[in-house]
C-alpha cells in the first residue's frame, strides 16, 4: 500500500493531522510503498522460536547430538511432548537427525538457523 492510499482512506480530520506529521516522519514521497507483512517463512520461524521448549531445544542442541529421552529429561518434560516439538523443528529444517538402530539423535541445524536470522534481520533492520 502506498502512503497516498493510506491518506486517502482517512477521514478529513485524520488526514489533516497525518499531513502535519509527514515531514517529521521523513515521508516525502506519497508514492512510497509501506510494507507491513513478513514472509510466511519468517512468520513460521518466529512462531517456532516463541515457544520456550522449542527455543530451549535449539539452544541445548547447538553443539551436541542428543536423543529424545535425554532432551525430555533435561527439559523436565514428557517425551511425547518433546517428540512433538522435534517434529515441528524438523519440519522447518532447524534440526539434523541421525539414526543409530532404533535411536534417533538430534542437533541444531546452525546453517538453517543462521539463514532465518539473516532473513529476519534483512526484513526488520
Labelled PLM ranges:
Residues 60, 74:
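Residues within the alpha-helical elements of helix-turn-helix
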Amino acid at each position: 500500500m502506498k502512503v497516498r492510499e493510506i491518506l486517502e482512506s482517512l477521514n478529513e480530520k485524520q488526514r489533516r493531522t497525518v499531513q502535519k506529521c509527514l515531514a517529521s516522519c521523513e515521508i516525502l514521497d506519497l508514492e512510497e510503498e509501506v510494507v507491513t507483512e513478513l514472509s510466511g517463512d519468517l512468520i513460521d520461524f518466529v512462531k517456532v522460536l516463541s515457544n520456550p521448549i522449542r527455543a530451549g531445544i535449539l539452544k541445548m542442541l547447538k553443539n551436541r547430538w542428543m536423543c529424545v529421552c535425554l532432551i525430555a529429561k533435561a527439559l523436565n518434560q514428557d517425551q511425547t511432548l518433546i517428540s512433538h516439538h522435534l517434529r515441528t523443528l524438523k519440519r522447518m529444517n532447524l534440526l539434523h537427525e541421525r539414526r543409530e538402530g532404533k535411536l534417533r539423535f538430534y542437533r541444531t541445524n546452525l546453517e538453517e538457523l543462521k539463514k532465518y536470522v539473516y532473513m529476519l534481520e534483512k526484513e526488520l533492520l
